Amino acid sequence: MPSQKSPTKRSPTKRSPQKGGKGAKRGGKAGKRRRGVAVKRRRRRRESYGIYIYKVLKQVHPDTGISSRAMSVMNSFVNDVFERIASEAGRLTTYNRRNTVSSREVQTAVRLLLPGELAKHAVSEGTKAVTKYTTSR
């Protein structure tokens, strides 16, 4: 009869959590201790275009609301368009052997990325915003 090893029960070994590894434990709400007193950790702020999207919505449709899911979609959309315009403007700056992204590059990027009438409206609104900013300074 072949000798079979019976499975031995192993007691779980206590390991100290490693910094940044899988076993690292997350700090609770109490956070760090200073002089024996628990100090609450401040939550990191989440940046969003939510308030601006809401303001524009109220300008266009004052009696309409927006769900948090729809707000999340709109926020993602604005972030995506911003990233596209910024990267295209950066590319144009590199092509023209410049170091600074100016309003001209941003305007050209908008013309390249947005179709027809939408680009015209975006350029006119952008120009209006830049003029308002320069006159207020």
UniProtKB/Swiss-Prot annotation:
<keyword id="KW-0238">DNA-binding</keyword>
<dbReference type="GO" id="GO:0005634">
    <property type="term" value="C:nucleus"/>
</dbReference>
<dbReference type="GO" id="GO:0003677">
    <property type="term" value="F:DNA binding"/>
</dbReference>
<comment type="subunit">
    <text>The nucleosome is a histone octamer containing two molecules each of H2A, H2B, H3 and H4 assembled in one H3-H4 heterotetramer and two H2A-H2B heterodimers. The octamer wraps approximately 147 bp of DNA.</text>
</comment>
<keyword id="KW-1017">Isopeptide bond</keyword>
<keyword id="KW-0544">Nucleosome core</keyword>
<dbReference type="GO" id="GO:0046982">
    <property type="term" value="F:protein heterodimerization activity"/>
</dbReference>
<keyword id="KW-0158">Chromosome</keyword>
<feature type="cross-link" description="Glycyl lysine isopeptide (Lys-Gly) (interchain with G-Cter in ubiquitin)">
    <location>
        <position position="132"/>
    </location>
</feature>
<keyword id="KW-0832">Ubl conjugation</keyword>
<comment type="similarity">
    <text>Belongs to the histone H2B family.</text>
</comment>
<feature type="short sequence motif" description="SPKK motif 3">
    <location>
        <begin position="16"/>
        <end position="19"/>
    </location>
</feature>
<feature type="short sequence motif" description="SPKK motif 2">
    <location>
        <begin position="11"/>
        <end position="14"/>
    </location>
</feature>
<keyword id="KW-0597">Phosphoprotein</keyword>
<feature type="glycosylation site" description="O-linked (GlcNAc) serine">
    <location>
        <position position="124"/>
    </location>
</feature>
<dbReference type="GO" id="GO:0000786">
    <property type="term" value="C:nucleosome"/>
</dbReference>
<protein>
    <recommendedName>
        <fullName>Histone H2B.1, sperm</fullName>
    </recommendedName>
</protein>
<dbReference type="InterPro" id="IPR055333">
    <property type="entry name" value="HISTONE_H2B_site"/>
</dbReference>
<dbReference type="InterPro" id="IPR009072">
    <property type="entry name" value="Histone-fold"/>
</dbReference>
<dbReference type="Pfam" id="PF00125">
    <property type="entry name" value="Histone"/>
</dbReference>
<feature type="compositionally biased region" description="Basic residues">
    <location>
        <begin position="7"/>
        <end position="43"/>
    </location>
</feature>
<keyword id="KW-0325">Glycoprotein</keyword>
<dbReference type="InterPro" id="IPR007125">
    <property type="entry name" value="Histone_H2A/H2B/H3"/>
</dbReference>
<dbReference type="InterPro" id="IPR000558">
    <property type="entry name" value="Histone_H2B"/>
</dbReference>
<feature type="short sequence motif" description="SPKK motif 1">
    <location>
        <begin position="6"/>
        <end position="9"/>
    </location>
</feature>
<comment type="function">
    <text>Core component of nucleosome. Nucleosomes wrap and compact DNA into chromatin, limiting DNA accessibility to the cellular machineries which require DNA as a template. Histones thereby play a central role in transcription regulation, DNA repair, DNA replication and chromosomal stability. DNA accessibility is regulated via a complex set of post-translational modifications of histones, also called histone code, and nucleosome remodeling.</text>
</comment>
<feature type="region of interest" description="Disordered">
    <location>
        <begin position="1"/>
        <end position="43"/>
    </location>
</feature>
<feature type="modified residue" description="Phosphoserine">
    <location>
        <position position="11"/>
    </location>
</feature>
<feature type="modified residue" description="Phosphoserine">
    <location>
        <position position="16"/>
    </location>
</feature>
<dbReference type="GO" id="GO:0030527">
    <property type="term" value="F:structural constituent of chromatin"/>
</dbReference>
<keyword id="KW-0539">Nucleus</keyword>
